[in-house]
């Protein structure tokens, strides 16, 4: 576990000379080997913790960029070692950022209040008017979702399952979000109440609100240009690209959604591929594929 210390007066003066400001310099803590060399035009407020900035990132085309903080505003943020945070239009608030994160040209990233990050959101699957809602969570399986949606003649079972899910969601709720190690977020818009796992790559997303991106090193998640997601959970190894719009959806592992696909109140399980069309209140089973334009699926189970 890292140990932190307060800034020295010399370090505070160096930061001021680089056009950095703070509401209270005493609220900023740094690791022992911290240096101010790569921090410019940055504003700090609340409790801020900073790691070291020693390594470089190699970008596409051979461009090299040194880790550091450039033209950013941080509020109640912990920054890991060797991160590059640059050109944040508004601010980053209430986040713990892992090592080697690369965040550039982003509008805003924040957690506002206590969030469950998509856990516990009820998805009105199979009946768009409600009655068979499935509360989604990080560990949702097709089997569990099937029972929750179709075994409504077993009300005690459904009630107990929902209690377990609610308990899990509450245990994972926090007023601080996490951005994992080796995460890339570039050219993105509005990111609010989103938990982002290791090695996730977000490029040009329009809006991500109230959700979890359960990425990891072995199966990273990619979120592409123009994507808009509200009240969602996306599992490891999935790709959501090209203007896809999701509202109250669960995306299981290794799914691919793209080409302006639109879905609401739907569940997509392992290895689904959805492109071009629309979905409302569907239960998409394993290995389901649709890539035709004007395909509209409503209120059904599709395998």
Model-found features: residue ranges?
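Domain-scale signature associated with acetyltransferase and cell-envelope carbohydrate enzymes
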Residues: 1-303
């Amino acid at each position: 576990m890292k140990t932190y210390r307060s800034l020295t007066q010399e370090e505070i003066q160096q930061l001021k000379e680089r056009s950095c400001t703070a509401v209270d310099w005493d609220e900023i803590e740094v690791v022992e080997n911290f240096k101010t060399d790569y921090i410019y035009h940055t504003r700090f407020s609340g409790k801020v913790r900073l790691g070291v900035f020693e390594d470089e990132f190699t970008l596409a085309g051979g461009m090299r960029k040194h880790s550091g903080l450039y033209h950013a505003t941080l509020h109640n943020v912990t920054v890991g070692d060797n991160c590059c945070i640059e050109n944040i239009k508004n601010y980053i608030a209430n986040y713990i950022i892992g090592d080697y994160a690369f965040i550039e040209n982003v509008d805003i990233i924040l957690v506002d209040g206590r969030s469950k990050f998509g856990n516990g959101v009820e998805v009105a699957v199979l009946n768009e008017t409600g009655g068979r809602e499935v509360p989604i969570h990080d560990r949702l399986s097709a089997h569990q979702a099937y029972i929750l949606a179709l075994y409504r003649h077993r009300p005690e079972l459904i009630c107990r399952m929902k209690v377990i899910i609610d308990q899990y969601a509450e245990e994972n709720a926090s007023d601080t979000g996490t951005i994992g190690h080796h995460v890339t977020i570039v050219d993105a818009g509005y990111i609010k109440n989103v938990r982002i796992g290791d090695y996730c790559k977000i490029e040009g997303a329009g809006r991500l609100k109230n959700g979890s991106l359960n990425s990891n090193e072995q199966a990273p998640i990619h979120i592409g240009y123009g994507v808009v997601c509200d009240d969602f959970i996306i599992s490891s190894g999935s790709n959501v690209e090209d203007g896809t719009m999701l509202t109250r959806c669960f995306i299981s592992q290794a799914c691919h959604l793209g080409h302006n696909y639109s879905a609401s109140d739907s569940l997509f399980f392992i290895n689904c591929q959805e492109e071009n069309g629309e979905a409302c209140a569907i239960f998409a089973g394993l290995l389901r594929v649709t890539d035709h334009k004007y395909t509209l699926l409503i209120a059904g189970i599709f395998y």
